[in-house]
Regions:
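Short, solvent-exposed beta-strand/turn "edge" segments of beta-rich domains on protein surfaces
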Residues: 2-5, 71, 101
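Short, charged low-complexity intrinsically disordered segments located at boundaries
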Residues: 38-47, 70-76, 111
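Surface-exposed, charged secondary-structure patches
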Residues: 52-92
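Compact beta-sheet-dominated globular domain cores
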Residues: 79-132
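Core segments of small alpha/beta cavity-forming domains
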Residues: 1-59
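Short amphipathic alpha-helical surface micro-motifs
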Residues: 42-49, 59-64, 93-97, 108-110
């Protein structure tokens, strides 16, 4: 239960950080491993290069369920299915809508893998994979 509580907070933090209009990963950096950070950062650079920015309103998380957990050596991986509702759109530099709808609630389905080293004194988990 404690893990899922933290996973829900991490999910909302990462989604809103990735989708805010500054095109930078800031508040969720410590929640991402290097590979995921680089993937997200590259996507944001490409969006920024096109002159686009995102607007998101996180409505809420409908569900978060542990789908699988696997221990490999000292590393524990937990796969979580999320269903959330957001309002999102991408705008260009002239504020014209490129995609999405700023007035429509959209349901999103994500499967994420969180990981932590069980021998580490750091209790925090990191996002290591997105499967959707």
């Amino acid at each position: 239960q404690e893990f899922l509580k933290g996973a829900k907070i991490a999910y909302e933090t990462i989604i809103t950080d990735f989708s805010d209009n500054d095109n930078k990963i800031t508040t969720s950096r410590s929640l991402l491993n290097a590979e995921i950070f680089n993937q997200f950062n590259e996507a944001l650079k490409q969006r920024s290069a096109r002159g686009h920015y995102a607007e998101i309103t996180f409505i809420g998380l409908n569900s978060a369920e542990i789908k699988e957990h696997k221990k490999i050596g000292n590393i524990l991986n937990v796969t979580v299915d999320f269903i959330a509702e957001v309002i999102t759109c991408i705008r260009d530099k002239d504020k014209k809508i490129v995609s999405g709808d700023p007035e429509k609630i959209k349901k999103i389905y994500d499967t994420w893998v969180f990981s932590r080293d069980t021998t580490s004194t750091n209790p925090n988990w990191q996002l290591v994979n997105t499967l959707t």
